[in-house]
From Swiss-Prot:
Its main location: cytoplasm. InterPro entries: Ribosomal_L11_MeTrfase_PrmA (IPR050078), Ribosomal_PrmA_MeTrfase (IPR004498), SAM-dependent_MTases_sf (IPR029063). The gene is prmA. One of its GO terms (biological process) is methylation. This is Ribosomal protein L11 methyltransferase. It comes from Streptococcus agalactiae serotype Ia (strain ATCC 27591 / A909 / CDC SS700). It comes from the Bacteria. Belongs to the methyltransferase superfamily. PrmA family. Disulfide bonds: none annotated. It catalyses: L-lysyl-[protein] + 3 S-adenosyl-L-methionine = N(6),N(6),N(6)-trimethyl-L-lysyl-[protein] + 3 S-adenosyl-L-homocysteine + 3 H(+). It is found in: Cytoplasm. Methylates ribosomal protein L11.
Length: 317
């Protein structure tokens, strides 16, 4: 019987996606998020009793490592790399690392119970790869394996990115997805009618994971995945560029994005905590973009900028 090491990281909610990605990079085969905010304000229904919880900025991210890895070495590596996040302006809070051994059957049950089909936007629903789900009329299904890496698509930053794509895509566009992670934004772009999608990520693990998720979704052979450092060296012009990454990294792609976005095209950015919003907005406007839409969900911000000479329909125009 195989055994696994279950490792739980208690961090600031702001660091959810970054830490989840890091856990996968260090060998985890799956992650699950426990957030007290998910229970706040919910009424008991369908026989379920939600626990009494208080608002907290901390969340618990549970990762599952095969017993072939030395969990103490993993914990030491994680502690060092989490400390480096502060240098990117991402506050992790007081990090605690707890671990325990788990048999394979328990891991399978514990891991999958966190994930159910989730309607994200008017048209888009994300469905775990193992779920037999029948789409309703007009519903577009994105199949993902949440255990692979890089989130499930239900984080506020991803939700707002998907909503923005749904608003700007009309069919036939070329899209560039910067920092693709799970590939969810590329898959959504294809389902929403984009003609060609180019997905880039600096992490080779993300490139593999994105391709595996893409392969699970029929009709997505118009998505081209490659390793890349933001937009460096990219010559392909696009109608839409979307990037759901840290604010301190977003400011380094706005100039290249303006170079590549076609006239009347869009730059969608997400992953921006409120205290970094002004910095990102100023970077995009300095590059030549005009703000068309600003979205806020909790402490997270997302935006749609437009490359246009007609500013009558943009914020402040």
């Amino acid at each position: 019987m195989n055994t696994w090491n279950e490792l739980t990281v208690h961090v600031n909610r702001e660091a959810e996606e970054a830490v989840s990605n890091l856990l996968i990079e260090t060998g985890s085969q799956g992650v699950a998020i426990s957030d007290s905010a998910d229970y706040l304000g919910q009424e008991d229904r369908f026989g379920e009793l939600y626990p009494e919880v208080e608002q907290s900025d901390m969340i618990a991210i549970t990762a599952y490592y095969p017993d072939t890895l030395d969990i103490e070495v993993v914990k030491a590596d994680l502690a060092d790399r989490l400390a480096n996040f502060e240098g990117f302006g991402l506050a992790t809070g007081s990090v605690n690392l707890d671990s325990q051994e788990l048999v394979e059957e328990d891991w399978a049950d514990n891991w999958k119970k966190y994930y159910e089909p989730a309607r994200i936007t008017h048209d888009l629903t994300i469905v775990p790869s193992w779920t037999d789900y029948e789409a309703k009329a007009g519903e577009k299904i994105i199949k993902l394996d949440p255990g692979m890496a890089f989130g499930t698509g239900t984080h506020p930053t991803t939700k707002m990115s998907l909503f923005a794509l749904e608003q700007v895509l009309r069919g036939g566009e070329t899209v560039i997805d910067v920092g693709t992670g799970s590939g969810v934004l590329s898959i959504a772009s294809s389902l929403l009618g984009a003609k060609d999608i180019y997905a880039f990520d600096l992490d080779v693990v993300a490139v593999r994971v994105a391709q595996e998720n893409i392969d699970m979704n029929p009709g997505t052979d118009n998505i081209h995945v490659a390793a890349g450092d933001l937009l460096k060296g990219v010559q392909q012009e696009a109608d839409v560029i979307v990037a759901n990454i840290l604010a301190d990294i977003l400011i380094h792609l706005t100039d290249d994005a303006y170079r590549l976005v076609k006239d009347e095209g869009y730059l969608i950015m997400s992953g921006i905590i409120s205290e970094k919003w002004d910095m990102v907005r100023e970077s995009a406007e300095k590059a030549g973009f005009f703000l068309e839409t600003h979205m806020v969900q909790g402490e997270w911000n997302a935006c749609v900028f437009k490359k246009t000479d007609d500013i009558s329909g943009v914020i402040g125009g």
